[in-house]
Amino acid sequence: MVSYTVLLQRLRAQLHINGHLVGVAAGSGMTGTYAMMGGADFLLALSSGRYRIMGRGSYAGYYCYGSSNDITMELGTRELLPILPDAPILFGLAASDPFIHLYEYLKEIKARGFSGVANFPTIALIDGQFRLALEEDGNVYEREVEALALAHHLGLFTVAFVTREEEAEAMLRAGVDVICVHLGLTKGGFMGAKKYISIAEAQQICDRIFSLCVRMRPEAIRMIYAGPANTPLDVDYLYRHTPAQGYIGGSTFDRIPAEQAILHTIRAFKNAGRSGVSETFATEAHAPDAVDFVKQYVHEHYGREIRLRDLAIVLHVSPSYLSTRFKQETGMSFTAFLLSYRMERARALLEEGRLSCKEVAARSGYLDYAQFSKMFRKYQGVSPRDIRSSEINTSRNP
């Protein structure tokens, strides 16, 4: 077990050195082991993670197929804690469980070796008539707030999943250590959500909630969970446009990588020795999601001329389909995304101070400096020379 003080010190140090944190909702001991080897800052034992490893959807943790708390306790004590005794592992607590006494159960969680608690499954993800019926029966979000307040009192690290400002405010007043904006089920893969908000909508939600956090308790760590953000590029976008300090993933780290690795490996073995076929299947198996492919291509080649119709040909889809799909997932047109990305990268290069304004323009895909300056001012609110001059003055007068 990692103590509260030690864990908080570790996370603060990581934020200072690396700038961001990564939490992993591990559904098995194997996932947890490799997550920690990869540099995860903490693990979460959640019943939904266990169901994912069984090949079921994450929301299975919300139904009465079994006791969520019992499933989580077994996952943590039989798989995660024995092989990762020095890792910070958080317990996903179903606070509305009618068969537990919150205070006594939290003491048991701590005694079994867990370093902290998160409110999951959370009623925050339920709405409509079913939510009203649950609340009439006493299953309210305030119960989760109470649970994390008690956990904090007992010296457990606390992660609060929230979906709107009112929930974040209540959790901040309860003294939680992390506010994590839950953006819904993770998109992608065979079992991923087919309906989800765009990355631009996610940005707006995070910005509202995190702005509240900064005003109320700036020391509280601000993180994001899942939804449309399932690639490093998505998370990088949210880091650049919101005050987010970290990312927690479940399917992103255990289901999607496992789906891809198993599928690709079996196909490769299935077609081993079949001349001329292996390459075809390998290419098909590794074909990325169209929108992810476009975003990755922009990331790697933003300084070149990029046309959506050319990318559509490579992906074997129509330009109109790719354009519509891209806007649905990102909340912006391809042209707006490309321009925004180019201007963000240009600003970063200008702030580094090693290149002239014209050199930065050329690296950003602009041979006409006047056009580059015009677009930069439109997207960044200042001219390239203003940024460059500011960096020169800063270096001369540290």
Describe each PLM feature range.
Residues 308-338, 361-383:
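Basic/polar phosphate-binding segments, predominantly the helix-turn-helix DNA-binding elements
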Residues 55-63, 191-202, 253-280:
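C-terminal helical cap(s) of enzyme catalytic domains, especially alpha/beta-barrels
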Residues 42-54, 116-127, 178-192, 242-263:
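Glycine-rich phosphate-binding active-site loops on the catalytic face of alpha/beta enzymes
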Residues 31, 38, 42, 58-141:
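Active-site beta->alpha loop and helix N-cap motifs at the rims of alpha/beta catalytic domains
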Residues 374-398:
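…primarily DNA-binding HTH/wHTH and HhH modules…
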